[in-house]
């Protein structure tokens, strides 16, 4: 997500593709909630650490200690134990047992769920529409490529 879109690879016949390949041209936002844990915690922390865009929703769960399945018991089962901890430049050790706070906190209520609404998603859409209004992403028009004479 952090790779910058630099331009397009424009084939003679075919559809232009992003350059570098698979880069995005536009604004980003992360949507998260209290059920986001483990790699979801780390994704949200990384998204904030890199300054890729706002985070909308609720604070993440806060469970990033990694486990290792090192020992096998005589009955064939395996035990796991805490083994790895995550430290971020900006957040330090604070993600474990706390989580990542959103930039814009939105509480989803049981009533909205019953009504079939997702208040966090609705707020995220509002934020992105406003950002697009303030910082539009213009469409690209490709002129004919220049004619290059053969070298002499």
Q: Model-flagged regions — what are they?
A:
Residues 1-152:
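C-terminal "post-core" interaction segments
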């Amino acid at each position: 997500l952090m790779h910058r879109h630099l331009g397009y690879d424009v084939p003679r016949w075919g559809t232009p593709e992003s350059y570098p390949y698979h880069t995005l041209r536009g604004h980003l936002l992360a949507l998260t909630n209290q059920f986001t844990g483990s790699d979801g915690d780390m994704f949200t922390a990384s998204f904030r650490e890199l300054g890729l865009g706002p985070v909308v929703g609720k604070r993440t769960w806060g469970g990033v200690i990694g486990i290792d399945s090192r020992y096998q018991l005589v009955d064939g089962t395996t035990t796991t134990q805490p083994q790895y901890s995550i430290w971020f430049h900006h957040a330090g050790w604070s993600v474990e047992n706390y989580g990542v706070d959103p930039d814009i906190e939105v509480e989803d209520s049981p009533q909205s769920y019953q009504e079939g609404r997702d208040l966090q998603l609705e707020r995220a859409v509002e934020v992105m529409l406003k950002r697009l209004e303030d910082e539009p992403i213009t469409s690209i028009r490709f002129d004919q490529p220049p004619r290059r004479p053969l070298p002499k």
